[in-house]
Amino acid sequence: MYQPDFPTVPFRLGLYPVVDSVAWIERLLEAGVRTIQLRIKDKRDEEVEADVIAAIALGRRYNARLFINDYWRLAIKHRAYGVHLGQEDLETTDLKAIQAAGLRLGVSTHNDMEIDVALAAKPSYIALGHVFPTQTKQMPSAPQGLAQLASHIERLADYPTVAIGGISLERAPAVLATGVGSIAVVSAITQAADWREATAELLAIAGVGDE
């Protein structure tokens, strides 16, 4: 039963690019994306604050769902749409502060045990990964594959879910066929020969999400 402690999100968030710069945020919002995440790693808050401010402003301009990865204090301070946290961040984050600020929360998971941890936090959505091998970041866990993803989707029922990890244009239809609400992509867009074409094709498959 989907009863999060944080504001709800649509079951279908649509195509959900995860990018590391404001430039990518802007060009993808201009291209029609309406759910997006800014993920800048391993910098101090003061080093990324200007980027967070700019990304949130763009999200508002395009009426988009803009999630900030990890930098939850800045997301609260500048009132982002939401925050995305990894498992390792849950214990060190003031979830009640995020909740009190009215921000949505997404949480990464990689197996059933981590799904249990995520469900205990009652986030707005749960990310499931990595589905396929990925070069975007080092992963300690093995790829889950489509059968395991489908099993997680069945377990989570009406909970909004996002599949992530090695999802290409060619693989996207099979991933969505598991019943997952949304697909997060990184290199399928940022490393595409023509990112505009790749984005348009992925939007045609995954949509922009429900209101």
UniProtKB/Swiss-Prot annotation:
Residues annotated as binding Mg(2+): 70, 89
Keyword field: Magnesium, Metal-binding, Thiamine biosynthesis, Transferase
A GO CC term assigned to this protein in UniProt: cytoplasm
Catalytic reaction(s) noted: 2-[(2R,5Z)-2-carboxy-4-methylthiazol-5(2H)-ylidene]ethyl phosphate + 4-amino-2-methyl-5-(diphosphooxymethyl)pyrimidine + 2 H(+) = thiamine phosphate + CO2 + diphosphate; 2-(2-carboxy-4-methylthiazol-5-yl)ethyl phosphate + 4-amino-2-methyl-5-(diphosphooxymethyl)pyrimidine + 2 H(+) = thiamine phosphate + CO2 + diphosphate; 4-methyl-5-(2-phosphooxyethyl)-thiazole + 4-amino-2-methyl-5-(diphosphooxymethyl)pyrimidine + H(+) = thiamine phosphate + diphosphate
Known EC number: 2.5.1.3
Binding locations of 4-amino-2-methyl-5-(diphosphooxymethyl)pyrimidine: 37-41, 69, 108, 137
Cofactor requirements of the protein: Mg(2+)
UniProt enzyme class: transferase
Cofactor: binding details: Binds 1 Mg(2+) ion per subunit.
InterPro entries: Aldolase_TIM, ThiamineP_synth_sf, ThiamineP_synth_TenI, TMP_synthase
Superkingdom of origin: Bacteria
Pathway listed: Cofactor biosynthesis; thiamine diphosphate biosynthesis; thiamine phosphate from 4-amino-2-methyl-5-diphosphomethylpyrimidine and 4-methyl-5-(2-phosphoethyl)-thiazole: step 1/1
UniProt record, GO biological process: thiamine biosynthetic process; thiamine diphosphate biosynthetic process
Disulfide bonds: none
GO molecular function, one term: thiamine-phosphate diphosphorylase activity
Residues noted as binding 2-[(2R,5Z)-2-carboxy-4-methylthiazol-5(2H)-ylidene]ethyl phosphate in the record, renumbered to the chain: 134-136, 166, 186-187
NCBIfam families per record: PRK03512.1, thiE
Reported function: Condenses 4-methyl-5-(beta-hydroxyethyl)thiazole monophosphate (THZ-P) and 2-methyl-4-amino-5-hydroxymethyl pyrimidine pyrophosphate (HMP-PP) to form thiamine monophosphate (TMP).
Family: Belongs to the thiamine-phosphate synthase family.
Protein name stated in the entry: Thiamine-phosphate synthase
UniProt source species: Salmonella paratyphi B (strain ATCC BAA-1250 / SPB7)
Chain's gene name: thiE
